[in-house]
Amino acid sequence: PKYEKKILNKDKLSHLPSFFGLDYGFINDPSAFLHVKIDDNNKKLYILEEYVRKNLTNDKIANAIKDLGYAKEEIRGDSAEKKSNQELRNLGIPRIIDVKKGPGSVMQGIQYLLQYDWIVDERCVKTIEELENYTWKKDKKTNEYINDPVDSYNHCIDAIRYATSNHFLTLDKKQSNSFNIFRKAGFGL
């Protein structure tokens, strides 16, 4: 995704809703915890903070979230790590929620996120590194890119997808309900 780098002031963005996401890693891949804000009216996604490290056990992840001051926030964690999410709850992160994933959810999440202008705090160096290196798989026969991201340089991006997943599902339902209202009124959308 295209993005703009700048120093972001959390206080100036405090009127926008916050979203938190966690992608687990360990030895080869880092764990990534991100804080983002969404401005739906202006179609902007702000990436405010990241905590990205390798070799983190769940107790260290919980302590980092507490140290950042987000232990009481709703955090969306990778549902492939239900056991880790439960352990974080036991370690004092009570509002971590398993992200609902299904067929096509990665592409759906990316497509939603691409509708927004990304503004990344320049201190989020790992997120910036991923955005610079994120790429798509190529068809072996045609050498054309296909709608399937390469599974590298994606941990921060996955955490952003998780953080915003429920927001976009809620938006989808609101838009769907609006269309249903128009249909019922005879507008035939």
Model region roles, listed by residue range:
Residues 167-189:
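Acidic two-metal-ion nuclease catalytic site recognized across multiple nuclease folds
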Residues 150-171:
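Acidic, Mg2+-coordinating catalytic module of metal-dependent nucleases/exonucleases
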Residues 23-25, 51, 80, 160:
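Anionic group-transfer/hydrolysis microenvironments
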Residues 31-37, 161:
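Short beta-strand scaffold segments in enzyme catalytic cores
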Residues 1-25:
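ATPase catalytic-site recognition across NTP-hydrolyzing enzymes
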Residues 34, 40-151, 170-171, 187-189:
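Mg2+-dependent endonuclease catalytic cores in nucleic-acid-processing enzymes, primarily RNase H-like
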Residues 26-30, 42-43:
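Coil-to-beta-strand transition motifs
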Residues 26, 38, 164, 168:
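Hydrophobic/aromatic-lined pockets within catalytic cores
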